[in-house]
Amino acid sequence: MPHASRSASQPELTALFTSVHQHFQDVIVPLWQGPGWNADMALPYEALDAEHKPLPPQRYRAMACARQLYLFSSLIGQVPKAEERAAALFRSLQRHFHDAEHGGWFYSIDPQGTPLDQRKDLYTHAFILFACAHYWDKVREPLVESVLNAALEVVAQRFATGDGLYEASLDRDWSSLDSGPLQNPLMHLAEAFLATLSVREDAAVQNALIELCTAMQKRFIDPRHAVLMEKPLGAVDNWFEPGHQFEWYFLLQSSPLLRGSTLHASLERAFAFTEQRGVDQQTGAVRAMLELDDHPRDATQRIWAQAEYLRALTLRPDSEASVQRQLQALQQSFLHAGGWYECRDEQGEVSRKDMPSTTPYHLATCYRGLAEYLG
């Protein structure tokens, strides 16, 4: 079925997506325009409780600021005052988190705005890069591109280890913490590189992305099942996460540059195995963490993993029924009139009722994938 006709040929799925997306625009986004926004700090609170009150602040993270910058950048032209909010978040990223002495960005500040965890971590820098690429695409301001370039420079000069991979964490002055590479920050770096390439030509970024994926295949792919492990092969106490398998699959399958790569072939081969081990066939719930020997390490159901599985399904062949089934599961199990449930336990009981500021990023990228799927 041609993509352009999906919305016409699947009125039930289209109506369901319209309802879910309306909930996002009418319920979830306003939470972060109103009660989730600390106007004094010009930062989002880390989380809201079920009554939409901010949890008492312990810290503010640069990564959370960057994810909300992506969120409101994506809403420019769709939601009133999204551009003003994105501009405020961009300013706050620099004002609160940028390290003027050593370069790069701190992990977190305390409730008064003083640097708290001053380490430099790849996960944070990847999201700053990702958010700035999307924001620059919308506003084309030179200052935004200069921050994008600064983030790319820091990643290449400070985090890179010369083998296609990157340190997960460094000290404030860029000295080694012997962290080594970890899957999740590297995935978000790949996502950030793809975002950069979607808004401009950049040969250095393209080469870095290809080298990263080549190194991921070599260092992280389990040779038997072709799943991506969370730590490099041979590390003690290793595991894999179905949500991350699905997230990687979407990034690779949706990229003409990476589709057909060896890493893509591995994730393609592992997809059915990941579904079989990591998704409850009755409820569609995605399990959080698995051992290779089939033992669930953590059977918690998290909304972000549900969103990533749903987004990945939009790129699978003959997936119309499963896309609709998973969208219904997301709506029925995780969305509610006041927002969303972040986690359910193995029995399906709600185990986390607060709503973190970082989750709308996952929903926004999922819904973007669904909108493209429906044409």
Language-model segments: residues:
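Glycan-recognition and catalytic cores of secretory/periplasmic carbohydrate-active enzymes
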Residues: M1-G375
